[in-house]
């Protein structure tokens, strides 16, 4: 089988439509919109250029692809179904280039729902069947557009709570971090969704997304950044009795900068109480690390109910390391530490956490 055979990148039923259109049809003009009734009133359009460059650009129709598609469709649906004549015409008359024109809003643009995001039309009257043949492929733009929209809305949410709690906004670009690689359906999905996230935030662990701007958008800038961090396999490598020893090992071997540590391998409360207890070896190790210029430690609870656990962790950290008030009266940690939730969140849960923090007197910047 030929990889990415354009003749086959469609729905089965669309292969039959070339003989269903009225005789004399010469032009098909199709458009994509985000339907009214969506969760948000604007859609961030993103991902089209990738689809064009990956699947539609260049001499993509070949004799081998036509022959393969003809044989497959004959067995899949029936003989004389595949539009061999139409594809052969594109190969012979257009040298394998698709005779279509695609127009779209600039990628990254927020567009009110109910408005056209892109249009597709044929540029050769004999290829009237082609625009809608490409619908299944082009509509894959829904996924990166959805992720881009969601990240943009979360950024608005974070910005709002930073403002109302009197927080500095130095960390806004990193308040929503992408750990989505393992949750994506494929590496391609991770690349698309991960780069969509980077339209609004700079924090990501999805390395697959980092090359997207240069490879498909002629932009060599790096837009995603991460930090050194642990996972449960690291923190539990010496067992429950060796937890503190392993934490000390992690801190001792960490490079300068931000260090993120998962704290719920056994009991997050025990972890934070020991970390904040003056005079303990762990407390001294943390304070020594924080003495380094621009060093920061982020504590990451990954289990339990996110809202209540977040407030509990904030209070425990404040008891151990101290806090002060913003100009609007909300608590901020005295030291360069922070809290990160790494699992099971959606827009509503993020909103709940930020609202609960404000209600409990905590600034969003923590």
Regions found by a protein language model. Give the residues of each.
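Glycine-rich, N-terminal phosphate-binding loop and its surrounding beta-alpha-beta segment
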Residues: 59-120
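Low-complexity, highly charged intrinsically disordered N-terminal segments
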Residues: 28-83
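Buried, small/hydrophobic-residue-enriched core segments of structured protein domains
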Residues: 1-39, 90-99, 108-327, 347-349
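Short, surface-exposed acidic
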Residues: 223-225, 333, 364-365
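Anionic-ligand-binding alpha/beta catalytic cores of soluble enzymes and soluble regulatory domains
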Residues: 338-366
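Short beta-strand/loop segments at the ligand-binding rim of alpha/beta enzyme cores
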Residues: 331-339
